[in-house]
């Protein structure tokens, strides 16, 4: 069974839970303006004390339960952008892709990972997660892929 989670009352759509290993996590959904063709939120998973977390399937199950609940309440797209401060973004991207691949409902979703290069040619990992039955599916997916292409375009 996943971890018991608490919704923070002061902040809409932010959840906190503590693993059996004493690691504190928060999951947040914040409205995002990147995609204009439909409602979108940025998804954030934070280990806010920075304690190293061992592999823990209950963390995955808890996070995916929270994501599932989000999609049951919202006809929105989720943007997942990996934290880059410590150089572990590629590992985070792979881990989240794996979590999503074993998620029971994954066939109902498009999970579209992309790499965005910054000015220093560093790889930044992002993904669009959207229900296949979202009424704005085609518009949001094409806007996301066009935005990634634009961000990766080389200035002349």
Predicted regions and their residues:
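Conserved donor-binding loop and adjoining core beta-sheet/short helix segment
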Residues: 13, 18-52
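Single conserved hydrophobic/aromatic residue that forms the stacking wall/gate
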Residues: 1-7, 11
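Acidic, proline/glycine-rich low-complexity IDRs
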Residues: 107-156
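Short, charged low-complexity intrinsically disordered segments located at boundaries
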Residues: 10, 92-100, 124-135
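Surface-exposed beta-strand edges and their flanking turn/coil or helix-capping segments
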Residues: 30-32, 39-42, 93-94, 140-145, ...
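Acyl-donor binding region in acyl/amide transferases
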Residues: 37-115
């Amino acid at each position: 069974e996943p971890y018991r989670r608490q919704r923070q009352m002061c902040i809409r759509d932010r959840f906190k839970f503590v693993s059996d290993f004493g690691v504190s996590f928060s999951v947040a959904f914040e409205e995002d303006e990147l995609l204009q063709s439909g409602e979108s939120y940025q998804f954030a998973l934070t280990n806010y004390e920075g304690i190293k977390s061992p592999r823990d399937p209950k963390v995955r199950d808890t996070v995916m339960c929270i994501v599932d609940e989000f999609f049951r309440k919202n006809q929105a797209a989720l943007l997942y952008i990996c934290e880059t401060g410590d150089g572990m973004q590629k590992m985070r991207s792979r881990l989240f892709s794996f979590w999503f691949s074993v998620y029971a409902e994954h066939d109902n979703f498009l999970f579209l990972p992309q790499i965005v290069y910054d000015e220093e040619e560093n790889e930044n990992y992002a993904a669009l997660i959207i229900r296949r039955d979202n009424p704005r599916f085609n518009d949001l997916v094409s806007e996301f892929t066009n935005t990634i292409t634009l961000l990766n375009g080389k200035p002349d």
